[in-house]
Amino acid sequence: MRKILYSLSVLFCLILSSCFGDLDTMPLDESQLVTENVYSTAEGYTGVLAKCYASLILTGQQGGDGGDGDLEGANEGYSGYIRLLFYLEELDTDNFLMPSTSNGLRQCLNLQWDAANASVVTWTYQRLYMTIAYTNEILRECTESKLQERGVWDALKDDYIHYRAEARFIRAYCYSMLCDLFGSVPYIDENTGVKDIPQQWSRKEIFNFALTELQQIENDLAAPGENEYGRVDRVADWFLQARMYLNAEVWTGEENYQKAYEYAKKVIDDGHYPLASDYRHIFLADNETCSEIIWPLVQDGQHAQSSTGTNFFVKAFVNGPMDELYQTGVGSRGWGNVRAKTTLVDAFDADDVIFNTEDTWGNQKKDKRAQFMTALPGQVKETWDENMAMTSTFTCGYGYIKWRNVTKDDQLCAAGDTYTSIDFPLFRTADAYLMAAEAILRGANAPRSTALDYVNEIRERPYMSDKYAQAGIRSDVSGKINESELNLDFMLAERQREFASELVRRTDLIRFGKFTKNNNWDWKNGERTGTDVDDKYLLFPIPESELVNNPTLKQNEGY
């Protein structure tokens, strides 16, 4: 069942041609996307829904980088949503470095982008609106009257409410990300006409729309744990509401930490997605068995190939020689691109950072989240060369190796090592624990002891202490902290340890007031140890191409 939804997406990709030019927020013309052939069967509708999901991790119509990509004029290998979000949410923070100067990566690394000099920013904007266009399409076509008219009502009458709710959920997620990244953006829905010029909504209006959608569809989504793998249910809805409420003060100017706590607590208390027994299992090729993942974006080495999903999170983070030190799952295919910044390394105890070739899973570390490569010849922690300059030398900086294209028993998966089979955990329960704890520290009505319990639950797991202890794995040091250690600075550091590379770091730093100022890291503002930058970088600019095609839009302040 794991890959059925995404296999359907591949099947219908050839019918659902999806190239986009410059008018990225314009609604799709029916002749471009929709044919009666697509909607003549129940499977056709399922395929369109699958395309909505798959557009967040796949890139085109042929798999891999085989051409016929979704975005016209974009590099298919670069332009998948998850990879793009890494550049916008991780590369410009205290987590990771890539030395590349192509497609705006150096501008992202240095926090020196503008409306025209960073293709990856433009492609992220386009990707989100492309997915919104797909969801609008199925919402137009998946109505009771059209199902009756096309003779598929009997086949879909029990499912179409779920299909519509899931499409609205995906659309709400995309708008929440546009709200986060770009602020005030154009609004389109299923009623926007082909010739209509999309109107720009304020950041608060976009926020309120997405939140209202989540509230309206909650009971139309599948009950917790009742949907097939890869599709969302009510727990995903609660999770996204918690995330939006937690960021509401930044995004709208009005805080609602009480609601953030309540919805995060619902995710925890529901119990359908309990924490995995081993942190490391969340990022492996058989992570479809991992109970913690609420919303996985499905990747498969045979049936759902992409160089932009978890394929990137393995290959870009390793080089060929590393496969001789441990089982990367991609053989010698590593690209040798991404290194950890010194600030990420320093978030862990120095003893835990060191890679032991006799203990490649880190079983004898205290904190098993400290998954670094330090054993390459000449490897150093610093991300600069002997002249204190930026360098492409992969051993200037430690590797980060929590993503591995192998199974829990350290075996290659059946799909092989050309592409990865690791599903990306877009939402997972550990985040609900830390969101709830943070909301309490920010004023939600719950005891501080509850926040402490939530944080300690998250910390016990990677220390494998107390109830998480397993034979043969070090568990003599508890991960628990005491009440006096629990504060917002600790929460920000803990989120870095728990979620590094999981596409939330920029959002976290902004929420804690530590993104543009009051906190520096390698190469921020182009300086080796970092300096403050202008507050305009709290938002990305509306792409210049979008402003040209829709002159009614107003650019974000400072660009």
Regions found by a protein language model. Give the residues of each.
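Conserved, well-structured interaction surfaces
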Residues: 41-42, 46-50, 54-60, 92-181, ...
